[in-house]
Regions:
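Extended catalytic cores of very large enzyme megasubunits
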Residues: 1-181
Length: 181
């Protein structure tokens, strides 16, 4: 079969309207710059995936409506949007060359990027952190606060590590022996 790709600017506008891309990208780049990105996208790189690799990209990283299965971008769109988002606040003088170099590196799989960046950096979630270490002290407010932090980070696709080293050990007394841990 044949298919036609949606030009990047049109794709961005549609995905912002649908609420799946962060609208801030349009504040960072001009339409001319976004059209330039479109000329850099190498669609043939999508054809170099193995079946398993493409399934993983589609299932885990492409922006989509997981309830309907509707996918809103191609792998190359994803890579370009990641590069554009990561370098959006760099100086105008250098950022375009950084976007191109980074796009080329990630779209050719020369470097790997963490799941939260691949899955969420161009979305309204804008998750940049890959792994987060959550500390907890040996008090109920600290334990509950840590639980809340864990829930919020997991909802934003971050990996979690928990430092529970300051929580008392098993068989320790709680409230003077009222409860045993």
């Amino acid at each position: 079969g044949q298919y036609e790709y949606i030009p990047l600017l049109k794709l961005i506008l549609r995905n912002i309207r649908l609420g799946v891309y962060d609208k801030g990208i349009l504040d960072k780049y001009s339409k001319t710059e976004i059209k330039k990105f479109n000329t850099w996208i190498r669609r043939d790189r999508d054809l170099k995936f193995t079946y398993a690799g493409l399934r993983q990209i589609c299932d885990k990283y492409l922006v989509q409506d997981r309830s309907s299965g509707q996918i809103y971008e191609t792998p190359q769109d994803m890579y370009m949007m990641i590069a554009a988002t990561l370098f959006a606040d760099y100086p105008n003088k250098t950022r375009m060359s950084y976007v191109k170099k980074y796009y080329d590196a990630i779209s050719q799989h020369k470097i790997n990027i963490p799941t939260p960046v691949m899955a969420g950096v161009r979305t309204p979630i804008r998750q940049f952190a890959s792994c987060v270490l959550v500390d907890s002290d040996d008090t109920l407010p600290s334990i509950f606060s840590s639980d809340m932090a864990i829930g919020l980070y997991v909802a934003r696709r971050a990996g979690i590590g928990i430092n529970a080293g300051r929580i008392r050990g098993i068989n320790s007394k709680i409230r003077g022996g009222e409860v045993q841990h």
